[in-house]
A protein has these predicted regions:
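Catalytic-loop motifs flanking and including active-site residues across diverse enzymes
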Residues: 7-12, 62, 66, 123, ...
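A broad detector of short, well-ordered amphipathic alpha-helices
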Residues: 10-13, 84, 92, 142, ...
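Short glycine/serine- and small hydrophobic-enriched flexible loop segments
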Residues: 13-21, 72, 146-150
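Adenine-nucleotide phosphate-binding core of ATP-dependent small-molecule kinases
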Residues: 47-100, 137
């Protein structure tokens, strides 16, 4: 992968590295470790070798799923460092494009009520505070259509776009 800094995969990889460093006693203790160990189905008191063995099987989407552990542990010092770095990376990416208005999409930036752990979304708050003027779209396609309409001076409603997207995807399943 060439980029995707601050993404779920990026944060998930940082979580795995933090857990490995904790288990190996090369890094600080973090509550992320417990979440990673449980998610991988490893026994308590496992070794870093056990963790490494399990991570060899992981697909990118599996790695990205560990980002939720970091979001749920945002009071943990290491988790807050990872989230701050992720937010900084996302902001840097957006600023490099020079966009006037940003549409956030994706699970990590979803409102906190849609997260498994029901915690305030610190990552999203950090990104919004740095950029200002952000809009959230529940699906990237909705955000892209909304932005395209805005560029052309056409007002599109995100809810209508999302409903159209759902209808279209349902018809393909039949």
């Amino acid at each position: 992968m060439l980029g995707d800094h601050g993404s779920g995969y990026w944060i998930g990889r940082k979580a795995l590295r933090a857990a490995a460093a904790d288990l190996d006693r090369r890094g600080p203790s973090t509550t992320i470790t417990r979440g990673v160990v449980e998610a991988l189905g490893l026994p308590r008191g496992c070794t870093v070798q056990g963790l490494i063995g399990k991570t060899k099987e992981l697909r990118p989407a599996d790695v990205a799923s560990f980002a939720q552990i970091v979001l749920s542990a945002q009071d943990d010092k290491i988790a807050s460092i990872i989230l701050a770095a992720g937010a900084s990376e996302l902001v840097t990416t957006v600023r490099s494009v020079g966009a006037e208005h940003v549409i956030l999409a994706g699970g990590l930036l979803a409102p906190s009520t849609s997260h498994k752990y029901q915690r305030p979304n610190t990552l999203r708050a950090m990104v919004e505070d740095s950029l200002g003027g952000c809009t959230y779209a529940s699906h990237p396609v909705v955000g892209a259509c909304w932005a395209a309409g805005r560029l052309r001076g056409v007002e599109l409603h995100k809810v209508d776009l999302m409903n159209a997207l759902e209808v279209r995807s349902d018809s393909r399943r039949r």
